[in-house]
């Protein structure tokens, strides 16, 4: 059986990792082992960040809707309940956009929710 020399594959792998580590400080962009550790950590953090982003935006939308609803005299949970029972299907992202960009329309939505809840 022939001997396998890994020089080409190893060099290719090292080049790939060092390219990903471009712009890192000091040895983290020059030395393979530290660069590899940094790249692995960076990729893991990027993966986790993509998951957290969804949670963070949902929280932001809820905070915005709650603030706008309270200005109109209704809490977030009561507002959402009133909207759901009225049969209005608007997601939180759109509600938060309406609350910021078109307060008049949002006030009308709050009135619909209040009428549905008999408040």
Swiss-Prot record:
The keyword Ribosomal protein applies. Gene3D superfamilies: 6.10.160.10, Ribosomal protein L20 (1.10.1900.20). One of its GO terms (molecular function) is structural constituent of ribosome. Coiled coil: none annotated. The keyword Ribonucleoprotein applies. InterPro entries: Ribosomal_bL20, RIBOSOMAL_L20_CS, Ribosomal_protein_bL20_C. Keywords: Ribonucleoprotein, Ribosomal protein, RNA-binding, rRNA-binding. Pfam families: Ribosomal_L20 (PF00453). One of its GO terms (biological process) is ribosomal large subunit assembly. It comes from the Bacteria. GO terms for cellular component: ribonucleoprotein complex; ribosome. Belongs to the bacterial ribosomal protein bL20 family. PANTHER family: 39S RIBOSOMAL PROTEIN L20. Binds directly to 23S ribosomal RNA and is necessary for the in vitro assembly process of the 50S ribosomal subunit. It is not involved in the protein synthesizing functions of that subunit. This is Large ribosomal subunit protein bL20. It comes from Clostridium kluyveri (strain ATCC 8527 / DSM 555 / NBRC 12016 / NCIMB 10680 / K1). The gene is rplT.
């Amino acid at each position: 059986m022939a001997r396998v020399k890994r020089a080409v594959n190893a060099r290719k792998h090292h080049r790939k990792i060092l390219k990903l580590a471009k712009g890192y400080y000091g040895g983290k962009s020059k030395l393979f082992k530290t660069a590899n550790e940094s790249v692995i950590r960076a990729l893991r953090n990027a993966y986790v960040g993509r998951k957290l982003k969804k949670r963070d935006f949902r929280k932001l939308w809820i905070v915005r809707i709650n603030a706008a609803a309270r200005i109109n005299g209704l809490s977030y949970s009561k507002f959402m309940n009133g909207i759901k029972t009225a049969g209005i299907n608007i997601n939180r992202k759109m509600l938060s956009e309406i609350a910021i960009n078109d307060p008049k329309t949002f006030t009308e939505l709050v009135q619909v929710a209040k009428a549905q809840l008999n408040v």
